[in-house]
Amino acid sequence: MPNRKYADGEVVMGRWPGSVLYYEVQVTSYDDASHLYTVKYKDGTELALKESDIRLQSSFKQRKSQSSSSSPSRRSRSRSRSRSPGRPAKGRRRSSSHSREHKEDKKKIIQETSLAPPKPSENNTRRYNGEPDSTERNDTSSKLLEQQKLKPDVEMERVLDQYSLRSRREEKKKEEIYAEKKIFEAIKTPEKPSSKTKELEFGGRFGTFMLMFFLPATVLYLVLMCKQDDPSLMNFPPLPALESLWETKVFGVFLLWFFFQALFYLLPIGKVVEGLPLSNPRKLQYRINGFYAFLLTAAAIGTLLYFQFELHYLYDHFVQFAVSAAAFSMALSIYLYIRSLKAPEEDLAPGGNSGYLVYDFFTGHELNPRIGSFDLKYFCELRPGLIGWVVINLAMLLAEMKIHNQSMPSLSMILVNSFQLLYVVDALWNEEAVLTTMDITHDGFGFMLAFGDLVWVPFVYSLQAFYLVGHPIAISWPVAAAITILNCIGYYIFRSANSQKNNFRRNPADPKLSYLKVIPTATGKGLLVTGWWGFVRHPNYLGDIIMALAWSLPCGFNHILPYFYVIYFICLLVHREARDEHHCKKKYGLAWERYCQRVPYTHISLHLLEHSTYLICKLKYTSHLCTWSVCYLGFKH
C-alpha cells in the first residue's frame, strides 16, 4: 500500500470539488481504506479529497513567480519598441505600479473569498446528532432548463452543489463557473481502475470454494425435502440414485427454454438505453424488452395448453430440471472464465480480479461479457430464471388441480402465484432499473450470478408452490385478505423506495424531483436524505422482507420448510447491506459518515427498536449475530 504524501496538520492547497479553484486547507486525517484526505478549510468546512486534488503551497508560489517574471532582454526589448505618432492607440497602457496595485487588489479579493450557501438552494440548517446538517434542497433544476444545455454530469454537479464561491466584492457569474467546469472535464484524464482486488468477500478462496458445492447441495436438499410426506428438518430424504438425477430429454427441454428466451432478447422491439458510465468511462447500450418477452412467453404457454400439452411435466421432473440447470450454469461459468482471460484490463470486474482462480471463477472475472451486442449477464439477470419462476408456479398450480382432482386451485396456491407474479411483472416492467444495481455495475459474471439466476431463483423461489402441491393448506377468506394487505404494504414500500432512487440516479435534474434533499459528495453525486431514504438507509430491503413473509404465510405453520425463503432472504439482505455499507464508505468517505449520522438506522426494525426497552435492544444485537452466522447463503441473484 503506498505511503501517504501529506501529514496531519500540514497546510496545503486543496481543490474545491467540481471546480478548478484551489484554497488553503489543513490536513486533519487520512483514511487508509479509501485513500482520502480529510481537510479543513479556513471557514471550518471539512471535506474528503483525493491526493490528486491536493497541491503543495510552494508549487503555487513558484508558478506565480514564473508567470510574473520575464527575462531582462525581453523587458528591454519591449520597452525600447516605439509607436509612431500618427498611429491610434488601442488602449491606455497601465504603469507597472498600477498593475502591481491591481494584482495586490485581486489577491485580496481571492483571499476574501468565502464559502457561503447559495440563496436559491434553501439549505436546511437544523442540527442532527450535534452537527449542522447542510443538506441541499434540489430547487435549482427548473433554472437549469432555462440555462444553456450542459452535459448530464455537469448538470448533476450543478444541482448537488452545496456551496457557492462568492467574493465579498462581487459574485462570479454562474455561466463562467460552469464553463470552467466544462474545460476541466475536457482536459481531465479518466482514472484507471485498480488492477487487483485486494478485499476478498464470501470467506475468500476457501469460502467461495465451499459455496460452489454447498449451494447446489442446498437446492437438491430443499427439492427432495418438499417431495416427502413429512418434510421436517431432521427427517433427511434418502439419497436418490445418480442415474435418476439426469435425463437427457429434460436437459434438452431446458436448453430449448434458454435459447427460446435468447431469441426474444434479440428481437428488435423495445427501447435502447445507455447504462451507467464504466471505469473506461464508456457506456454500454441495452435493449429494454423483458416485458415483451414475458408477454410472448405467456402467449406461447397459452398455445401449448390449448393443444393439451401437459405442463405438470415440470412437477414430475422437477429434480431433473434443477440438476440440468445446475449443470448448464457450471458449463456457462467455465466458458465465462476462459473468455475473461483474454479480456482487456478495463473490462474486468472490480470485485473479481484477485488473481486467485477459484475466487475469480466464483465472483466473476469479466464485468460485462458480450457476444457482439448480446450481453450475457444482463440477459440472465431477468429472463430465463425470473420468467421461468412464473412458469414453474403455473405448472405447480395445474399439478395441484390434477393430483387432488380439483376443479379450481386452492386459495393458498392462488395467493402464492398472484403475489410472485406481481413481483416478476414489476421487475420486468421496471427492467431499466436493474442497470443501476451492483449486479450490473460492480459484480462480474461468474458462477455466483450464473447459478443464482438460472438455478436458485426458479427452483428455490418457487418452493412455496412446490410445497403446496404435496401439502395442501386450507385458509379462510379473512386470513387471505390479511395476507394480501401485508403483501400490498411490502410492495408499496419496495416500489416507492426503488422508484425514488432509480429516478434520481437517472436524472437528478428532473423538475419532478425538485423536492428531494441530498448530501453532496466529492464524486459529484448526491446521497438522498428525503422520503424513505431519509427514514432508513435500506427501505427497499424492508419491503422485500415483508413480501417474502406474505409469500410463505399461505403455506401454514406445520413445517418450517416453506419459510426457508424468508430466513434466506434476511441473511441475503444482511450480507448485501454490509457490502453496500462498505462500498459506499469507501466511495463517498466523509460524506457517507455525515449521511450515517443523518440516517442512523439501516432498516425500519432498528428504528422502532430504539424506542423499546433495553431488553429488546439487546435482542436486536443478538439477532444480528445470529444472521451473520449463516450469511454465506446470502449470495446475490
UniProtKB/Swiss-Prot annotation:
Residues 98-110, 124-151 have a biased composition (Basic and acidic residues). It catalyses: 5alpha-cholest-8,14-dien-3beta-ol + NADPH + H(+) = 5alpha-cholest-8-en-3beta-ol + NADP(+); 4,4-dimethyl-5alpha-cholesta-8,24-dien-3beta-ol + NADP(+) = 4,4-dimethyl-5alpha-cholesta-8,14,24-trien-3beta-ol + NADPH + H(+); 4,4-dimethyl-8,14-cholestadien-3beta-ol + NADPH + H(+) = 4,4-dimethyl-5alpha-cholest-8-en-3beta-ol + NADP(+). It is an enzyme of class 1 (oxidoreductase). GO terms for biological process: cholesterol biosynthetic process; neutrophil differentiation. The chain crosses the membrane at residues 206-226, 250-270, 288-309, 317-338, 378-399, 403-425, 466-486, 554-574. The modification Phosphoserine is found at residues 95-96. Pathway: Steroid biosynthesis; cholesterol biosynthesis. It is found in: Nucleus inner membrane; Nucleus; Cytoplasm; Endoplasmic reticulum membrane. GO terms for cellular component: cytoplasm; endoplasmic reticulum membrane; nuclear inner membrane; nucleus. Residues 74-97 have a biased composition (Basic residues). Its EC number is 1.3.1.70. Residues 57-151 are annotated as: Disordered. It is a multi-pass membrane protein. The keyword Oxidoreductase applies. Residues 1-62 form the Tudor domain. GO terms for molecular function: Delta14-sterol reductase activity; DNA binding; NADPH binding. Catalyzes the reduction of the C14-unsaturated bond of lanosterol, as part of the metabolic pathway leading to cholesterol biosynthesis. Anchors the lamina and the heterochromatin to the inner nuclear membrane. The Tudor domain may not recognize methylation marks, but rather bind unassembled free histone H3. Interacts with DNA. Interaction with DNA is sequence independent with higher affinity for supercoiled and relaxed circular DNA than linear DNA. Belongs to the ERG4/ERG24 family. This is Delta(14)-sterol reductase LBR. The lineage of its organism: Eukaryota, Metazoa, Chordata, Craniata, Vertebrata. The gene is LBR.
